[in-house]
């Protein structure tokens, strides 16, 4: 019997999806065939994953709650039935994809099985309930190990046709040396302050490190880029807050290096093979161990830190970040 493999991941954050790419690829390699994905539309996965040979097709589902719960379940049922999947792998603990699999009569429904999800799986090989304490990447790693699926490379990688992206976003193609600052985050407590990015830019500019800086930021936090530009009063900033992911990728791929908060674009930059520096103060660098991100932390930083106060980001100074970068550039 021919196998038809679907992998479902329900989280909306870009960074979380990027962390799952090695596990998606490992499942594809295990079956020696490309796989289908079901993801949230907010990830813009169809734009960023279209050049990955291990991915066949991507469908979107919003995985909503409340009155939309069952609407989205039956959307999943429809996708499953249309594609006649033999296997559905779920890379998080959400019940919805497993329930839809049961309704569709899928023979192999595989997932972490944490909480109620285990009721709807077709296997007893699951994580234990204490594994919810693991981060999403470690949960997926353990799930694959339990099912004897080899993970050949734990580091996320993205293959992008940069020529195509450059053509779409030609307004970002400034002449000269460019770097990128990732200035926002989904969680405010992870964000370095605007005036500190301004000071870092001044220090780097004195050393002729760049001609322009791309400011990478989501549209919902465009006030951050505006504030940086207003404080600085310099014309070397390029505001990318209105750009979609193709624009963000264009900016990052045309940068010599990336410096930014612990957020999706930082993970994206590392996956794109750009030298990437993460400003880590209030959260754990151990969560990012399967990454090529270089961490910049304040003095006396302790790993597995969980601080939910943005003011603590002030403990990492522009001078410290500049000195770290300067040492790396020697």
For each predicted feature, which ranges?
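Catalytic machinery of carbohydrate-active enzymes
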Residues: 1-330
């Amino acid at each position: 019997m021919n196998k038809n493999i679907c992998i479902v991941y329900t989280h909306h954050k870009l960074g979380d999806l990027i962390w799952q790419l090695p596990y998606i690829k490992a499942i594809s390699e295990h079956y020696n065939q490309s796989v289908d994905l079901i993801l949230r539309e907010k990830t813009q996965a169809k734009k960023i994953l279209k050049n990955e040979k291990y991915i066949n097709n991507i469908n979107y589902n919003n995985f909503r709650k409340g009155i939309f719960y069952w609407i989205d379940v039956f959307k999943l049922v429809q996708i499953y039935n249309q594609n006649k999947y033999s296997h559905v792998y779920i890379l998080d603990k959400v019940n919805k994809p497993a329930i839809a699999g049961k309704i569709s009569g899928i023979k192999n429904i595989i997932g972490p099985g944490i909480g109620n999800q285990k009721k709807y799986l077709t296997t007893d090989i699951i994580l234990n309930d204490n594994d919810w304490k693991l981060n999403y990447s470690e949960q997926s790693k353990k799930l694959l190990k339990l099912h004897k699926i080899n993970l050949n490379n734990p580091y996320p990688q993205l293959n992008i046709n940069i020529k195509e992206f450059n053509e779409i976003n030609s307004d970002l193609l400034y002449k000269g040396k460019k770097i990128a600052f990732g200035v926002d985050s989904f969680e405010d407590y992870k964000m370095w302050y605007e005036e500190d990015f301004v000071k870092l830019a001044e220090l780097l500019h004195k050393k002729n490190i760049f001609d322009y800086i791309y400011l990478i930021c989501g549209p919902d936090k465009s006030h951050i880029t505006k504030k940086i530009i207003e404080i600085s009063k310099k014309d070397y900033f390029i505001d990318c807050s209105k750009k979609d992911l193709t624009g963000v990728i264009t900016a990052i791929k045309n940068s010599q290096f990336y410096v930014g908060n612990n957020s999706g674009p930082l993970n994206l930059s590392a996956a794109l093979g750009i030298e990437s520096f993460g400003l880590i103060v209030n959260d754990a660098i151990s969560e990012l161990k399967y990454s090529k991100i270089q961490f910049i932390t304040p003095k006396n930083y302790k790993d597995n830190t969980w601080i939910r106060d943005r003011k603590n980001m002030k403990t990492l100074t522009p001078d410290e970040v500049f000195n770290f970068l300067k040492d790396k550039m020697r």
